[in-house]
Amino acid sequence: MAQASQCIRNFSIIAHIDHGKSTLADRLIEYTGALSKREMEAQVLDNMDLERERGITIKLQTVRLQYPAKDGQTYELNLIDTPGHVDFTYEVSRSLAACEGALLIVDAAQGIEAQTLANVYLALENNLEIIPVINKIDLPSAEPERVKQEIEDVIGLDASEAILASAKTGIGIEDILEAVVAKVPPPQGDDNTPLKALIFDSYFDAYKGAISYVRVMEGRVAKGTQIKMMSSGKVFDVTEVGMFTPALRIVDEIKAGQVGYIAASIKNVRDTQVGDTITDAENAALYPLPGYRKATPMVFCGLYPVDSSDYGRLKDALEKLHLNDSSLVFEPETSSALGFGYRCGFLGLLHMDVIQERLEREYDLNLITTAPSVVYKVNKTDGEVLSIDNPSNLPKVDEIETIEEPIVKANIMVPSDFVGAIMELNQEKRGNFLNMDYLSANRVTLHYELPLSEIVYDYFDQLKSRTKGYASLDYELAGYKAASLVKLDVLLNGELVDALSFIVHKEKSYARGRRLVEKLRGIIPRQMFEVPIQAVIGQKVVARETVKAMRKDVLAKCYGGDISRKRKLLEKQKEGKKRMKQVGSVEIPQDAFMAVLKIDD
């Protein structure tokens, strides 16, 4: 093994959202002088405006720091920043696989949260050296001793040497860097064996093609090397290799233990899947690195342009986003109510939200979104098994044997005062209680099995509002379970509006149908004729409301006179309205499609 790799340390930062991860990364960059004071800005590793505004990390970033340690050596520290949100767990697991150590950041006031725990388990699975850091100790409400105790009780790490720091004021930054040098082991690996490099991220550059962020585990890679992707077998010629400072800097080669990027004129990000192994095309490794899997979308929804002439622009925008985000899937679909659009699949709700916001903001599109749905497995009577992500594609009732829905295993951390409120919420959401653990006298973790379809609507908002914002949630897919599910359709003036259909549990179908038609009655504007709104399951109408017609007072000119004269005028008006109703079409406002999401409000 090359002596040089003894001076390399690869580490990442893991934390719950808002515990100060990006700010700490800023301080480390500033302290080691990777960027000058002039180039520094808040959250320097968060490139998107959206990331800065929401204060979240979506795409993971990487930076190489040169640190002259107290022992006289200069070390190369590769910091791999990870997203903190549950939707991006797979990205976190891949970036942790590229490291030997991790800084565990815990907020001195809030203590351990659900996502902290989930990411710690990922780090332990990858056998990383974990260094606990208690951040925000400058806050008046900081309780470092309590948090130390929590780290020991909940995670089982020795917190006696936990570093007390404040990323905001710069306290403890040198201690953190020294701890990384002292505790994180140097990378193992031989420069002279066949190349094995783990892709932990990729993005698309208009000039260089898809660029892979890699951690070289074995061997070396330089410009001109022929590389092969082990999952697809595709071969490319390397045009450039380099490091991150955080900007890309070209170097001659990157070798075992180092983190860098590879550009090889790859036309499509789909060819550089996160978690895949790159090897030398001529002198190939026998086995890929473990842990690769394709990202599977969990939540689907329809995206339609408000102005149908924007369909082409929407297609271009989705394709451009897909270049940078291979977990986004989309295919064209048509709706009788909304025209042409796309059915899109996302990793989770935040992912869906972020993509929609980027489409509207970066590509200036005005979109209508249909209610999100999950992938159901339908076992038909003839033995065929279908995966349905769009309620409109559900087969007829008499062809269905059973419908299975995706189930998630949720861990909810709350102060013990709110346990009752959370149990009540989970009961409403058809949750199945597994067990609960007391982390301390006043903090509890509840373990539940919940249907994913109940989480995708407003579960997170409800969770926060019922616990005054104190609850934190982490979930993972736990398979499928058969359930009594039905498709609820909406008829407007006798016409089916496919974009308003959704799949719902039978027990809740009547109540939801009732609430939906009431909501739609308030949203759909009055027409010149009466508009019935019906919620139907199969052939059966379960709820109905009517939008009353606007009518002219045809009796205004009759002062007194014969009743039969008045009746004749009213009958004539009624006949006219009837004819209008047969040919009239109802304009559906955009709010109507959002009403499905907000039925429970």
UniProtKB/Swiss-Prot annotation:
Q: Which Gene3D superfamilies match?
A: 3.30.70.240, Elongation factor 4, C-terminal domain, Elongation Factor G (Translational Gtpase), domain 3, P-loop containing nucleotide triphosphate hydrolases, Translation factors
A Gene Ontology biological process term: positive regulation of translation
Q: Which reactions are catalysed by this chain?
A: GTP + H2O = GDP + phosphate + H(+)
Superkingdom of origin organism: Bacteria
Give the keywords, sorted.
Answer: Cell membrane, GTP-binding, Hydrolase, Membrane, Nucleotide-binding, Protein biosynthesis
Q: Where in the cell is it found?
A: Cell membrane
**Membrane protein topology class:** Peripheral membrane protein
Q: EC?
A: 3.6.5.n1
Q: What is this protein called?
A: Elongation factor 4
Q: Which species does the entry assign this protein to?
A: Desulfitobacterium hafniense (strain Y51)
Taxonomy, top ranks, is: Bacteria, Bacillati, Bacillota, Clostridia, Eubacteriales
